[in-house]
């Protein structure tokens, strides 16, 4: 691995007292530690900032930004609370001092070699712009991988090269930020990828903060915001409907998309983004059918 990477980690956290100590210990124990780590507390009510401040005193690269009162409304995820807190952490540093920028949630525990192996993947592919290891969840004796496509990168644990981060304009403070950033990255010629061979542990089950059906509806709204086509959304809803509670998950996904369309929720205003996003989805649908794209040109 190139010894020169300087990784900045920013962790937006809220009410993570149950997990934060394990998360902090894991970052402190990295074989290749970050150059700096900023934990941004977004109005926790469970003692999270006190835990972070107490432990930070013994970790030279760790700082805590305690905002006191959360800025999120009734639905912080839908209002982009996480990227907003992330960006407030970024404002404390000179990005030019770093080579990589990573978002790490307060409930994700890294294995000791995580950053070292991730930096090796970046070093091996100059076009890799956004990456992560897999996430697993559940009790230690039966942990299971959270399934995602290889081109998708978990929002809880994303790492960007500084070049890519600047090329995509940073993180948008809105619902769907973690789809928008990847689409822009591929649009700009970068690769996005998750790696299965160095997983991290996600302590709070995916979607548990908001509920399964509400989360599926939010995913449907994300699809609208990112200009995903009605055909793709319909096919996706059929696939999603196979997850528990059966049928209702697909209906919730469609509901989120249709509701966003009726309410005319603001979409990504870039026409080039819209064209690329729909082109990319068409290619994936054709590949899933084992049909050559040339046959449909």
Tell where the protein language model's regions lie, with residue ranges:
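Conserved nucleotide-sugar donor-binding
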Residues: 154-169
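Conserved donor NDP-sugar-binding/catalytic core segment of glycosyltransferases
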Residues: 72, 109-144
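Active-site-proximal specificity loops/subdomain of glycosyltransferases
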Residues: 60-98
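Short, acidic, metal-binding catalytic loop of nucleotide-sugar glycosyltransferases
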Residues: 25-34
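Non-catalytic, C-terminal membrane-associated alpha-helical segments of glycosyltransferases
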Residues: 214-297
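A conserved acidic beta->alpha catalytic loop
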Residues: 41-50, 69, 108
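Short beta-strand/loop segment that forms part of the nucleotide-sugar
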Residues: 34-43, 65-67
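Short beta-strand-to-loop acidic/aromatic patch adjacent to the donor-nucleotide binding site
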Residues: 97-109
């Amino acid at each position: 691995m190139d010894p020169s990477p300087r990784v900045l980690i920013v962790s937006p956290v809220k009410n993570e007292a149950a997990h934060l100590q394990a998360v902090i210990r894991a970052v402190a124990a990295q074989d290749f530690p970050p150059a700096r780590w900023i934990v941004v507390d977004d109005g926790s009510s469970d003692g999270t900032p006190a835990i972070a401040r107490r432990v930070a005193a013994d970790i030279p690269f760790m700082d805590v930004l305690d905002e006191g009162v959360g800025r999120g409304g009734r639905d912080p995820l839908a209002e982009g609370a996480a990227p907003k807190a992330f960006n407030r952490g970024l404002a404390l540093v000179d990005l030019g001092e770093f080579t990589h920028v990573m978002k790490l949630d307060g409930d994700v525990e890294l294995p000791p070699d995580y950053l070292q192996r991730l930096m090796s993947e970046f070093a091996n592919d100059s076009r890799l712009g956004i990456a992560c290891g897999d996430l697993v969840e559940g009790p230690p004796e039966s942990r299971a991988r959270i399934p995602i496509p290889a081109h998708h990168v978990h929002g809880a644990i994303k790492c960007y090269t500084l070049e890519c981060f600047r090329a995509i304009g940073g993180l948008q403070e809105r619902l769907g930020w973690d789809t928008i950033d990847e689409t822009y990255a591929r649009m700009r010629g970068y690769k996005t990828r998750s790696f299965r061979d160095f997983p991290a542990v996600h302590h709070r089950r995916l979607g548990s903060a908001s509920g399964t059906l509400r989360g599926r509806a939010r995913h449907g709204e994300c699809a609208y915001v990112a200009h995903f086509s009605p055909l793709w959304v319909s096919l996706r809803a059929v696939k999603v409907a196979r997850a528990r509670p059966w049928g209702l998950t697909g209906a919730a996904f469609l509901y989120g998309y249709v509701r966003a369309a009726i309410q005319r929720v603001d979409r990504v205003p870039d026409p080039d983004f819209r064209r690329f996003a729909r082109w990319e989805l068409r290619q994936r649908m054709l590949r899933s059918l084992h049909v050559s794209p040339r046959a449909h040109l």
